[in-house]
Amino acid sequence: MIRRLPSTDPLRPGRLLRLRGAVDRIFTGLASGSILLIALALVVVLAPMLWRGATAVLFRGTVEFRLMQMQKFGRGNRADLAVELVQVAEVRQPVYGMLDRFSRGIATDDLEEEARRLYREFGKQLDRRDTPAQERTELRSLAKHLRDDFTEAVESTDKAAAREALGRVLRHADDPRLKGTVAEGFFRMARDYGHIVDTVDLSRRAEYAKALGEVRDAIRALFGPRPGEPRPPLVMDQYGATRWDMAERQLARLLTAEKWVEVQPGQPLQRIEVPREQQFAGTDLVPLFPFVRERAVEMLDPRLTFYWQYFIDDSLSGHYFGGVGPEILGTLLITVLAILFALPLGVVSAAYLVECAGDGRVVRLIRTCINTLAGVPSIVFGLFGLAFFVIFLLPKFGFPQGASILAGALTLGLLVLPIIIRASEEAIRSVPPTYKEAALALGASRLRCFVTVTLPAALPGILTGVILSVSRAAGETAPILFTAAVAIGSTAWPPWSAVTKPTCTLAYSSYHIAVGDRLAALVPHNQYGMVMTLILLVLILNIAAILVRSRVAKRLRGQ
């Protein structure tokens, strides 16, 4: 037998300890670095979302926002708002005046229709005056010539021909037979259009008309409907820019025109911005743009606004206005119901697998299926929920066939069930065997031992699974897309009265805005606001579960 002699190197144990210490420090550093990287990644990803989402609550609200809040939600001081509306209307009036004067020479169809209307009204006026037949015939013939000459001037793109036709109209301005009649409108229109002819390039009238339409649209988006106009049916068209950031985008659209030009032959077109002053150079509309630029603040009166009601208000006009109250309530309902469905079933399943089933082939197969179920794509759960809960099962119990909170909660319950089973199973296994042995030694049955000893001791670990399940259920979109979600909804009260109806949720509404027609570009603050609200809601639910878990753990330790 060969005996190994003890080491005669007195430094070897010290070297091993130093090596082990160095390895420990390396792994500790790597672990700390990983944690820092994860924290940094969270900050990089979440900070911009939370920052931009906060603009849904804290922003500079304009007078249009205060008007919308008063009319739709009954908030604010009506008398102060009325005074404010009068003040901004006075500042805006010159804008409408400049638009009207310029558009008279551009909207030729309106001018021609006005000329025809004057001709008809003049004929009716002659009938009411009982004008002699011969004089009536002469005056109607004269009015017809005035109408035709004015129409010829309007339709002409040659300045000389237009001035000549207008001259034929104004030649009769001093005719005493036309004094005090409707026909004087021809002379007023001829003088106004003569000024247009002097200042506008008639050959570019079609180009001016298109650009004028863009200017009108931008002004309408800024200030809302013009005073005296019919109220638009869509809520989003009833008000101007309700926020200063929205107003700045509309101001840019008003003050600059976007054009796509070919810089080099054979190369893709490039977008350039042309100032509106350059686009309307030499016309009476040029002063409008510096006027709006300099007095935009007076026209909209932006004020710092803390819109905390964003979290309780119903959405209006497809999330264009309003808040996320129904989305928060729908998310809470469907998440809580899903956990209520999954938690008892998950704990019972875990208890059976640990306490009763042993470790045979069937049990190993069941565990494999549970692990596989945890990796199934959520869209598959959504399709299963549609086929089984929505179409087959719930109608069998008298529920209406269709999407509902109940169907969505059952589907999400199946989705998070593997998470709860695995977490509960590990929590039950982690309970020291001495707890169970002591209870059984005192004469407790296996069921009573589990309910009174094992389950309370495993509760902190089970709550860990609940925390993970809440985060998963609240953020899912695909399953509720088929089983529970609608794009727009209102707050139902009491909440349990709506379990058989579809609901809107934060996750699905964020998706709906993102894929909607232009809505994400028009109101990005609402999309980020929904994401921020979802993050905060999940964080609050997780913190609540963590506090409950901590309290349970302290009670188990006797603190």
Predicted regions and their residues:
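Cytoplasmic-entry segments and transmembrane alpha-helices of multi-pass inner-membrane transporters
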Residues: 24-28, 345-385, 422-423, 557-559
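Transmembrane alpha-helix signature in integral membrane proteins
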Residues: 29, 36-40, 322-351
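Membrane-interfacial helix termini and adjacent extracytoplasmic/periplasmic loops
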Residues: 51, 301-322, 357, 362, ...
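Interhelical loop and adjacent transmembrane-helix boundary motif
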Residues: 318, 481-535
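Short cytosolic juxtamembrane segments of multi-pass membrane proteins
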Residues: 549-559
